[in-house]
Amino acid sequence: MSVRLPLGQISSSKLNVLSQENKLHQGKRSVRPQLNTPSNSPSTESFNNSEISLASVLNTQTSSSQFYSTPPQALHDVKERINNELTEKNSKLTDENILRLRSRVQLAYYKYRTKQVHLKFSEIVSRKKQSANKIRKPENDRKSRKLAGLNPAIEATSRTNNNNNGTSNLAVCSQQHIQCITPEKRYPAKPYASTSAISSGYTPVSVKAAKSLLQMFSTGA
């Protein structure tokens, strides 16, 4: 069996090294070595009395170290691929998309010109339809009157008669595409003189009776 030796006889032990340093320099204070710092990086205490700056040493270390970066050829390929994708997206603009964009621009300009920016497209269309219906109503009335055979002059006379009398005094008579307007004839419900009185030669005394007789003779002729 192997006999276990004490730590003092192992030359490579760190405790043995420390014990030997303490024995050699008992009167002086020993400096503890920096065990946590890596071997390739110098300690900061070594730069206190030296003229070499810490920044220069760091720069030399970073320049000597190797960084794993992508080669320039791969970057160039990636850039070309991105540019090709962008050009393909731009080339996919069809005529339909162009028409949509054009219509949007025209609608925006129309809103700005008519001061209707706050309105939606549906509201603008509904207002446009309402104004068009208001304009079409008088045109439709004129067309219906033209189809009925009414001339503008006859329309004017009918309007004046309606305004004067308060009621429609016009009666339209149609006979084989011939249409005429005749005023209403108002006969007295009860004539002031009978036919027997007229035939006997009786003359009425009142002025109203005389006027009614004149109207009867004029209408009968």
Curated annotation (Swiss-Prot):
The keyword Protein biosynthesis does not apply. Keywords: Cytoplasm, Nucleus, Repressor, Transcription, Transcription regulation. It holds the Pfam family Whi5. Coiled coil: none annotated. GO terms for cellular component: cytoplasm; nucleus. Belongs to the WHI5/NRM1 family. This is Transcription factor NRM1. It is found in: Cytoplasm; Nucleus. Residues 33-48 have a biased composition (Polar residues). Its main location: cytoplasm. Negative regulatory component of the MBF complex involved in cell-cycle-dependent transcription. It comes from Kluyveromyces lactis (strain ATCC 8585 / CBS 2359 / DSM 70799 / NBRC 1267 / NRRL Y-1140 / WM37). Residues 21-48 are annotated as: Disordered. Component of the MBF complex.
